Every structure is written in C-alpha cells, then in structure tokens.
Amino acid sequence: MEEWKLPWEGGCRCGATRIRVTRPPLLTMACHCAGCQRMSASAYSLSVAVPADGFEVIAGDPVLGGKGRDVHHFCPECMTWMFTRPPGLDFLVNVRAPVLDDHLWVVPFVETFTEEGFAWARTPAPHSFATMPEMEGWQTLTAAFATEGARP
C-alpha cells in the first residue's frame, strides 16, 4: 500500500483558518444523518477521521457551533465547518474532507445513518450502516481501512 504523503494542510473558504494533519487517517466516512445534512447543506458530510495527536490548527482561532452533542469547529470569519471533536472519542478529530487542500482522493470507506439519507445519495463505501455501528465494530473497520482505504 502506498504511503500517505503527509503532512497535509487545509483551510476554510476564506483562508483565515488553517489546519495540518501529520498522522495517517483512521478512516474516511460519509454521514447521512439529518444533523450532518443540515450542517453541510448537502446530502451528507464527508470526513477524514485523524488521530488527535496528528492534528493541529496552524492559523486562526476556530469557534464552536452547530449545537448538539458533538463539538463542531468553524472558521470565525467565513463560518466554514472545518472539524468535529466527538465527545468521548478524545483520540480522534473528524476533519471535513473538503477543507483539505488536496481532497479529491477521499473516498468514503464507511457510510453511516443511511436510514436518514436521501435514497439517491449513496456512496461507493464498502461498509454501509443504517445508523451508527457499535463501538466494537470500529476497530475492525479502521484495521480494514489501513490496508484497503483510498490514498492521496
């Protein structure tokens, strides 16, 4: 399997907030839940889950928003939804794939909450779930992604 070509950088729409990823991702995913649809103003949100110790904000000072149980971070200038820190999962950060400077390689490996999604909006993800998989299942998914997931 090819190397990850790290580090990656990315930014918001206006360029005021920038991020850097220095460790390989754990997983790529599309979430079809109603919350992600509303937050992204799209059929689903596309994320790259990265280890928290391989993620940093290198410019700007993101603000919290979006409400709900997850902690969503936005650029304070253009309000681009940049990343999420799910509570209880302090080891990871869900980076919104489109904020990466080089993001066209991202293919969702997992899609979640398909029962809430548009019937026409399915992805090529090899693993699809009507809701959120149980926590025990994520270890198997991340191990599979490490060998089978798309690379830049």
List each language-model region with its residue ranges:
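A short Gly-Trp-Pro
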Residues: 1-152
